[in-house]
Amino acid sequence: MNNKIKLNFNYVLVIFFTTMVYTCKLNVHFKSELLNIREKYCNLIFDKKMAFIPMVSLKKNR
């Protein structure tokens, strides 16, 4: 009976650590995706501001 409890405990440890590793890798992938999305939107907003500023200055000069 003692060996069976020890074996079950080892299985629980293996499942726990594999779940932790998988979750950690998933979080890293998710964070990198969020950073990529943030960078795309920041570039998009920056490009729109750069295109918007000359139009405003041209209208003020007229």
Swiss-Prot record:
Predominant location category:
plastid
- GO CC terms: chloroplast
| UniProt superkingdom | Eukaryota
Keywords of the record, alphabetical order, are:
Chloroplast, Plastid
Q: Where is this protein found?
A: Plastid, Chloroplast
- What is the protein named? Uncharacterized protein ORF62
